[in-house]
């Protein structure tokens, strides 16, 4: 009888998993940068805390300011220090021009540089235009927008001498699209976007980048107080069918702070699960 046919060749090995083709390099470029957080909650909770912890995990030293460094701020300071980086909180009124100049110079003396500025403050005093008081308007603009100007103004000469720096303004999707009942908040966050774009044009030739992040519905202590029904209605409007996390925003902030975004400036990145396109 004829000999049996040779066995078929073995199948080719399967391709490597998809993620291996696009593995992200480590963000070693944050070490040993100094990051300054200007925030209504310092880096004590929510998005600010998530960004501070993410930056610290990548090796960045952390300085943050708040009107008062309370127990939350002190606890976060300890949590960041446990990651092996230098961290310090500073009590300062961000809406006061002179106070801001002093605290930024003090941070420069203590840390040696200010490489990344995160303007993360945000308060709300919502109301329809017909019922909104002047005090409601002024408070939101002062905390959300004027204090960002104060800190950028104070950090600019430091970053110019360094010939490098990354400024990250925390805006909001309502600063892009508006929202009824939030004209003061929307205006302040739209101002943060315009401020970032203008700074990017002014200081780009000095090696300084400026960008804005516009978060959508992010699950924080504030939004956790909403009813399940309200949160479900929000989720229906989001293509990814879920709210975002502070860590989602922190990942984008880390990208903008690092050299992975060295050719990215004057941009607004919406972190909203596709809610606004």
How would you name each of these model-derived features?
Residues 152, 188, 196:
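Active-site helix of classical SDR
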Residues 21-36:
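Short, small-residue-biased leader/transition segments that mark boundaries at the very start
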Residues 149-152, 208, 242-271, 276:
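C-terminal substrate-recognition "lid" of short-chain dehydrogenase/reductases
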Residues 58-75:
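Conserved glycine-rich Rossmann-like NAD(P)H-binding loop of the short-chain dehydrogenase/reductase
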């Amino acid at each position: 009888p004829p000999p049996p046919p040779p066995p078929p060749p073995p199948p080719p090995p399967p391709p490597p998993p998809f993620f291996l083709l696009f593995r992200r390099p480590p963000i070693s470029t944050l070490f040993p940068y100094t990051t300054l957080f200007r925030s209504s909650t310092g880096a004590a909770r929510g998005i600010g805390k998530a960004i501070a912890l993410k930056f610290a995990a990548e090796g960045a030293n952390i300085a943050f300011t708040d009107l008062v460094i309370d127990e939350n701020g002190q606890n976060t300071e300890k949590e960041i220090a446990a990651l092996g980086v230098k961290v310090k909180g500073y009590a300062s009124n961000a809406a006061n021009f002179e106070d801001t100049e002093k605290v930024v110079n003090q941070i420069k003396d203590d840390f040696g540089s200010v490489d990344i500025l995160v303007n993360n403050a945000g308060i709300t005093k919502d109301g329809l235009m017909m019922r909104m008081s002047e005090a409601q308007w002024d408070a939101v603009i002062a905390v959300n927008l004027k204090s960002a100007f104060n800190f950028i103004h104070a950090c600019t000469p430091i970053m110019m001498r360094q010939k490098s720096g990354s400024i990250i303004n925390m805006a909001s999707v309502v600063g892009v699209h508006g929202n009824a009942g939030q004209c003061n908040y929307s205006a302040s966050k739209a101002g943060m976007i315009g401020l970032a774009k203008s700074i990017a044009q002014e200081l780009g030739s000095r090696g300084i980048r400026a960008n804005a992040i516009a978060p959508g519905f992010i699950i924080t202590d504030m939004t956790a107080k909403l009813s399940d029904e309200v949160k479900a209605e929000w989720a229906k409007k989001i293509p990814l069918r879920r709210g975002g996390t502070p860590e989602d925003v922190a990942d984008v902030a880390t990208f903008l702070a690092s050299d992975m975004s060295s050719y990215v400036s004057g941009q607004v990145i919406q972190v909203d699960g596709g809610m606004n396109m």
